[in-house]
Amino acid sequence: NFWSVLSGRYEVAREEVEGVQLEVYHHAGHAVNVPRMLKAMRDAVGYASHAFAPYQHRVARIVEFPRYRSFAQSFPGTMPYSESIGFITDLRDTTRIDMVYYVVAHEVAHQWWGHQVLGPRMQGTGMLSESMAQYTALMVLEKEYGRAAMRKFLQYERDSYLRGRGKEGIGELPLMKVENQQHI
C-alpha cells in the first residue's frame, strides 16, 4: 500500500525508450530542465533494464509538486519531484554536479531497488534499496559525465555523511541496522 496522488494543470513531455513511455508532468513555466530529466530517465531505464532486469511498467513518470517540500520519491511507475530540486534548478554552471540528472537517475533506480526487489520489513532494510539505487545512479552518472564527475559526486556525499555524522544523537549503527539516518 504505497502510492501517491498529485493533481495540477500540467504540461507533459514524453518520449519512449526500451518500450517504456517516459513522461514528465510539469508546470508550463518550469520546462527548462525537462529535457535533462527525460535524458536521465532514458539513461537510467536503459542502464538498469540491461544490467538488472527489464523495467516492470509500461510508463515511468515524473510529476512536479510545489516547493513547499524539497525532495523526490519513487512510487511504482511514478516519481513525485519537487520543483525546487529539479524543475527550477539553475544548471548553467557546468562545473557543479548535475543534481537534477543524478536525483532523477536515483529515483528511477528505485523502480528496481525498492519496487521490484524488496527487502524484508525489518531494521536496516532501507540500506539495500538505497545503496543499490545509489550504485545504479552512480553508474548512469559516470557513463554520462565520466569518472571525474562521479568522484566529485562521491566527495560531495562523503562531506554530507561527515556533516550528518557530526550531528548524530544516537550514534552510528552497523549498516545492517541503519534506519532514519539520512547521512548514511
Over which residues does each language-model region extend?
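Flexible glycine/proline-enriched surface loops and loop-helix/loop-strand junctions
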Residues: 28-30, 117-118, 177-184
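Hydrophobic helix-coil surface modules that form long, contiguous segments used
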Residues: 1-105, 135, 147, 173
